[in-house]
Amino acid sequence: MNLEDIENYVLEAGSDDLATFGGFFEGGIHCQQVPDEIAPCIKEIADADFEIRSFLEIGVAAGGTTFLISHFLNPGQIILIDDNKHHKAGLRPEVLKGIDRVEIIGRSEDEAIIFEAAEYQPYDLILIDGDHLYKGVKIDFISYSLMLSLGGFLALHDSAIPEWGVGRMIRELKQNEDFEFIDEYVSKKHKPCGIALFRRVK
């Protein structure tokens, strides 16, 4: 899978906001990812010779990232958790039209939501992109990381925004013997958001 081709696909698929995420135009899949961050992250996972059978995404908005994961990694099961309070959440049915998925609507920290997500475990890829405060990211990690398969990937979005709490969580994860730090993808072409990628090894 060619990195340039992945990045161009993301650029041409449509951005949620050009100032925040870059891209060629606003609209399309309303992706909330910086193209030269999400592209190498996807390539790393695709090249790992590890089948992504089940994908859990926490914090979905319009579904742009879901669309990309479905397109490039083709997981057989897609589970989405979102409280639907994002102003672009109403676009999700159109963005994800034709993509089979289970949507769990509610706050990711709520016990009922965690229990429902657990019914579909294990997951081979989990993306945490919900509450970006340290406490919220920590709760999501504690609640969902045990649902990750051995060898599965854990991605955390917005790692490069210093005023948020994702960076602190990443520093802690680097000391966690159950996880291997793979890389952090930080844009060199646009204002960075950052994606950190880990793999469960224990």
Identify the function of each model-found stretch.
Residues M1-L127, D131-K202:
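A short alpha-helical cap/connector motif
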